[in-house]
């Protein structure tokens, strides 16, 4: 039967040193706790914590050798082992006589942070999600991502060390907000230290690197990474080059989806600049343009596979478009430029024939809603009653419509999504 006294707490053959090596510490152990542990035996002049692969080792250096010997001797003869937060700590003399350069690269304050993303799905955290998280603390100049033996990592460059420090203090050890991650991605946490870099070199805009100070930097074709290989996700599928323009395909379109309906749905994630609707392959598609890529990324991850109406109707399938700026010359019921103060509006014309005569249940998206069309269902993002009941006004608003009844809050397959807000990063967990 093992006991605390039988554990290898001391290295008896190691010659005494004023530097002690501590093992089995809690991984989040702080420098203050190490000083408190050694204070009864003398003056601790230096520490080095979070050492080792598991970050559960540390070194403490006393002012003189006798103080270190006193601490080792005390715990060698005591029935109560050294403890930090209730966890037994094993002590031994270090083979070093002093802690040299306690301020390692990771401790020297700088404007560039080294971020390690931890979690089974760490590689699925996009560079735009990282930008959303860190830009809450100040302007992010550049981000590069890469893989090392330590895992999936990123370098995040801020304007100055003060901004970087604020981000590090707030985010180190925290989890990425759940709403920023795709449903298939598990929890991912951040471990942050300072980097020795002061200015990152970014040659191409890609899914692995981004320079937010140089909009004219060329985009890496087909999201090819530095190894010359097409980037793939953990499922083996080719990763899409991200874009500020989304291509939305609407499946099972039993009810009208107008331009204003699309604007209400997509504007919940940020300012929508332009929308263009068109028919293709017997279905309705739309291009939605945001002002930046990161907003489009969040909208895509949140809306992909969800339905505009309860019952699985008007299901959204979203991909990135190769377009970056839509050309919209006039505003009508199929296209709109929300950045134009007084856009030209064409005069309405009566259709030559009833486009719904052949199939009254089919929606052709050319003339808005029709009296022969099915009544919109209760619940979902859009309230029934056609365009007039959406509360859209002239330019719409950035909130989902509240569900008409509590019963519609239960999400079935592809059903109603409860209201959410997608601004900056939310509270960390």
From Swiss-Prot:
InterPro entries: Nucleotide-bd_a/b_plait_sf, PTBP1-like_RRM2, PTBPH1/PTBPH2_RRM1, PTBPH1/PTBPH2_RRM2, PTBPH1/PTBPH2_RRM3, RBD_domain_sf, RRM_dom. PROSITE patterns: RRM. The modification N-acetylserine is found at residue 2. It is found in: Nucleus. Residues 331-429 are annotated as: Disordered. It comes from the Eukaryota. One of its GO terms (biological process) is regulation of alternative mRNA splicing, via spliceosome. The keyword Secreted does not apply. GO terms for cellular component: cytoplasm; nucleus; P-body. One of its GO terms (molecular function) is mRNA binding. Residues 382-397 have a biased composition (Gly residues). Residues 18-96, 110-197, 243-323 form the RRM domain. The keyword Transmembrane helix does not apply. PANTHER family: MATRIN 3/NUCLEAR PROTEIN 220-RELATED (PTHR15592). Plays a role in pre-mRNA splicing. Binds to the polypyrimidine tract of introns. May promote the binding of U2 snRNP to pre-mRNA. This is Polypyrimidine tract-binding protein homolog 2. It comes from Arabidopsis thaliana (Mouse-ear cress).
